[in-house]
């Protein structure tokens, strides 16, 4: 299970309430959080990054602006690393790509906790159906749901690392020949 990471500030600051902040904890964003923030800050990468840092750390915009630049750079780098990592990069031990373990378990639509899922390659009929969707996002959600059995709302609850892992494998399914998937001996 993923444990939140911590950065000890070299230059402690104060919270909006005047309390000292000496440590900042990082939590992975969910795919849904990131999608919402991306839509809100479409044309401003700096604001998007700061919104992602705020969502990951719980720091307000004012608290982020009170950080000294070296501490901010450390936090920014760690948040970006979490946002871009795949679950297999963060999970210790062997990773099963056919039945991946979730870095951060989610609650299913039925209320059960999901700690892993079964990933199956799409059929040609499924990829034909995927191509009928109007835009890239709809195609991505359709193929992700078809290959995992997750609903759109369950997909939105996946951590970005779990989402990145899923997308990496789906790209393999859509682009690689069968020989790519044979076990290596």
What are these regions (language model features)?
Residues 1-43, 55-57, 61-132, 153, ...:
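Charged interaction scaffolds used for protein-protein
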Residues 51-52:
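A detector of tandemly repeated sequence units and domain arrays
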Residues 136-154:
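Mixed-charge, glycine-accented linear interaction segment located at domain edges/termini
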